[in-house]
Amino acid sequence: MTPMTPMTAAPPPTATPRPAFPGRWVGGASLVLGPLLLLTGVLLRLRFDFFFPAQLGAYEHHPHLMTASYGCVSAGWVLLWPGVALLAARIGERSPELALWGGVLTVLGLFARTFHAGVDHLAFRLADVQGAASATRTVSETYGAFHIFSTLNAAVMGGWLLLAVGACRSRVLGPLRAVALAAASAMPLGVLKGTTPLSVAAAAGLCAALVPLGVAALREGPAPRAAAVSGRLLLTVAAGTAMYFFGQAG
């Protein structure tokens, strides 16, 4: 008789390690800070009319308020990209195709919004030098000019919709928070856009969908040592200060 070979148990499945980049700290902070900055900036210009002549007029009479508003919004969009990368990675554990397309399109949309913020900045500098009336005339005459980032307008809106579907299907977000995430697609896009009810709904939806996810990401895993936290904070402050002065040097 052939001797029976002992049965060996199959090795337990190993969990897929989560990527080190952007990581829970950078990604979690992004998911918390980005939406809150967006909502703050949107609310700061709530009382002014939506279209660009009123936005430039508001800047002429309230330069500090409008600078803070547009600064918060542009910083919020930029800070969101690590959070989008983290969200796409979580979605990709169960829905890789939606994670890929949703993540790529959303990040491309963030690039487009950053371009719009640069044009906003130039328009406000024109208002400083030439006055709001002259800046309004210049913007009006050049408003429809083609730029390469206009090809990303669909990505600005569609990326959030794909991420919302992927987040719901992969159970990263529940149905209500997925709908709130999809509301980000309603944020008006383009140059010198003021605040509308859709703007407030979109920014509030991002806060409802992403801030709790960011807090949960920050709480995952073991708490870091106090020395490590202090060191990273000091490094962040030092790097930020150096980058600020380097940028001012031109």
What is each of the regions a protein language model found here?
Residues 2-250:
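Hydrophobic, aromatic-enriched alpha-helical segments typical of multi-pass transmembrane helices
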